[in-house]
């Protein structure tokens, strides 16, 4: 008996229906641009209609592939050539950011168009940030009016969280800085940003992406000083930015001072040399005694390897503070400095759980060696303590405070009898 091998079925000639979700027209940049430009020309200056058009077009146009083209058109009216000029061989629209009215109200309305688009098509978020970075690099190729509009728009978008402050890195481009384009653009941008949010919010956004210490880079190296920065931004009506830069400069100086102090303490440099060095730095960097006592405390306590056992760490801390108390005494000559020190001790003990029971012993020691006065301790107890662990620390201090009050009363009665 012979068996004929059965043939397997083949797929030749079979046609499969494409799923609806995969039916997306493929465009090259020129076709894509024509579709967007045509839609924008039809919607005109009605930004609500523009937003609806962009929302619906995403279903049939490939926004993911042509994100750069899309954003070029919305901002400049057409595809941009390197340097910022519009490509000559492409269709363009007169309805875009650069041809709109140069005022904050109009730019806020355009910001809403971008917000709606990116909320609807989340994948455009990264491409939009890259677009703004590119546009900032092209600033020299734009007119002053176009720069102003872009600055206002960017400030609003930074304020409402649609952009990260990391885009500001483009403003540190050497050519933009040398031509003075960067600081002029930054003024418009910060005014717009601060009108959306306060300076604290702006500062937080800058810190988040490590831009807080780079603002001086908006100026050429030979003008990169706080004095020049302050004159420029204060003169432009942005004292908040000027003050922020000053605080950052001071913060940087304090960090360097603390680092140097820790090194000097660990090397066993004499107290006199350390105190003299600190006083010079205080003058040079305009650091108050109130700030200095905090820096000294942090430096002293950061220099140690602390025992993990609670019963041993107290003894270790008291010994360490007693030995270095002259360093604290040198910078606690004012009532406010003493209160600042007490608050720093409170924070330290709260943040380091092994020290929770050590607070009272530290304060008592510093009182005995004349770093802290009776008045400062009483004021801290009654009104100047922090919220951190206050119930624990106030309870610890009750007996000592009662003793101080009684001693004060006895002293007063003795004076009266005399």
Swiss-Prot record:
Record GO cellular component, one term: cytoplasm
SUPFAM superfamilies: ARM repeat (SSF48371)
A GO BP annotation: regulation of translational initiation
Region described as Disordered: 1-29
PROSITE patterns in the cross-refs: W2
Entry keywords, A to Z: Activator, Transcription, Transcription regulation, Translation regulation
Cited InterPro entries: ARM-type_fold, eIF5-mimic_regulator, W2_BZW1/2, W2_domain
Compositionally biased residues, Polar residues: 1-15
Superkingdom classification of source: Eukaryota
Segments forming domain W2: 247-414
Similarity comment: family membership: Belongs to the BZW family.
Task performed by this protein: Translation initiation regulator which may repress repeat-associated non-AUG (RAN) initiated translation probably by acting as a competitive inhibitor of eukaryotic translation initiation factor 5 (EIF5) function. Enhances histone H4 gene transcription but does not seem to bind DNA directly.
Protein name per Swiss-Prot or TrEMBL: eIF5-mimic protein 2-B
Protein species of origin: Danio rerio
Chain's gene name: bzw1b
